[in-house]
From Swiss-Prot:
Function description: Has exonuclease activity on both single-stranded and duplex templates bearing overhangs, but not blunt ended duplex DNA, and cleaves in a 3'-5' direction. Essential for the formation of DNA replication focal centers. Has an important role in maintaining genome stability.
Family: Belongs to the WRNexo family.
Comp. bias regions, Basic and acidic residues: 13-23, 36-50, 71-91
Record GO terms (molecular function): 3'-5' exonuclease activity; metal ion binding; nucleic acid binding
Lineage: Eukaryota, Metazoa, Ecdysozoa, Arthropoda, Hexapoda
The protein, known as: 3'-5' exonuclease
3'-5' exonuclease domain residues: 146-314
GO CC terms in record: nucleus
UniProt-annotated binding residues for Mg(2+) 1: D163, E165, D301
EC number, as in UniProt: 3.1.11.-
Length: 354
């Protein structure tokens, strides 16, 4: 009887959602190979393809979700190769704009400041005379000779390099002023050791206070203050008012900034290197007699000071001439624009296009 019965499909209720039977494609499952650290990128790709199934997975009648982002399985060796390749062939920048500094370096072909190597400068070699005195009467006679030479000069200003030395101890601090060195001519330096002097000779005081003498040095004002403390017959203020600090003058002429030491100023202006030996610099300057190293050290300090003064004087005169010529050819507005751009006018500029 049952074979004559017809099975009718049962209609589902309106609220029920028909469920589709999940269809699973029959096939031979692929076994995914195990990944090891020593696998090359090609082997990793083959192993990955071997374990993939192109049929989207379905669960409970839902369509399979797309596979997630594949993990980076690059080996350390592969990563190193990629990094090296990127460093050799860096990506191009989108912007082609150049700053003013990079544009000028590109046009001039000059290397960037980061790649510039420090220039090796030759050491100073002083071959002039060194006149060294330790007794009061000898110092007075020498100072009188220099004073007479100054008065014979036709120039209104006679530059004189001035420097001092004194002993220093970390236990007791700075000692009394022991040495004064001066230079009015690059061919001769005078070194006066003050150890045996209770008072400076009057002619030496007159020399450094002479109206035509322009004393100059690096941080020279502090030297005058110390000299006045150690020898009351010296007044520091008149000397400070008329002296020239070479570091300050360099900033004005070359339009640089910061504080200068004599060594750095020598590198920058004279293009020379100084042998600032700590052994000599911290030596016993009050002990008579000074040795050859001390004498050469003291002489070079004032000799190179005179060289720097002459060079700054030359640059200042050239700068004034270049500025006046530029104003005549291009006008005041162009001159101000060039100064705003950082032009120092130490070299000649005929015309400019703005």
């Amino acid at each position: 009887m049952e074979k004559y019965l017809i099975k009718m499909p049962i209609k589902s209720k309106a609220s029920e959602v028909p469920k589709d039977k999940a269809v699973v494609k029959q096939g031979t499952p692929k076994i995914r190979s195990k990944v090891t650290k020593n696998d090359t990128p090609k082997e990793l790709k083959n192993k990955e393809n071997a374990g993939e199934d192109n049929t989207p997975k379905q669960t409970n009648g839902r369509l399979g979700r797309p596979a997630g982002k594949r993990k980076n399985l690059d080996t350390p060796e592969t990563k190193a190769e990629k990094i090296a390749t990127e460093e050799e062939n860096p990506p191009k920048r989108r912007s082609s704009r150049l700053t003013r500094s990079t544009r000028s370096m590109a046009e001039d072909g000059s290397p960037s400041p980061e790649k510039e190597k420090p220039e090796k400068l030759p050491f100073i070699k002083y071959k002039g005379a060194i006149k060294y005195y330790t007794e009061s009467q000898d110092i007075a006679a020498s100072a009188d000779d220099v004073l007479q030479w100054v008065e014979k000069q036709k120039d209104e200003v006679v530059p004189m390099a001035f420097d001092m030395e004194w002993p220093f101890s970390f236990q007791t601090g700075p000692g009394k002023s022991a040495v004064i060195q001066i230079c009015v001519d690059e061919k001769c330096c005078y070194i006066y050791q003050l150890t045996n002097l209770k008072k400076l000779p009057a002619v030496l005081v007159a020399l450094i206070n002479h109206s035509k003498v322009r004393l100059h040095g690096v941080n020279i004002k502090n030297d005058f203050r110390k000299l006045a403390r150690d020898f009351p017959e010296v007044s520091a203020e008149p000397l400070i008012e008329k002296c020239v600090d070479l570091g300050v003058w360099c900033n004005e002429v070359c339009e640089t900034g910061g504080r200068w030491s004599l060594e750095r100023l020598t590198n920058f202006i004279a293009k020379k290197a100084m042998d600032k030996s700590k052994k000599v610099r911290m030596s016993k300057w009050h002990v008579i007699p000074l040795d050859e190293n001390q004498l050469m050290y003291a002489a070079i300090d004032v000799y190179i000071g005179q060289v720097i003064y002459r060079e700054l004087e030359r640059r200042e005169k050239a700068k004034i001439i270049n500025e006046e010529e530029f104003k005549e050819k291009n006008g005041e507005a162009a001159f101000k624009a060039m100064k705003t751009l950082g032009e120092t006018f130490l070299s000649k500029i005929n015309e400019v296009t703005l």
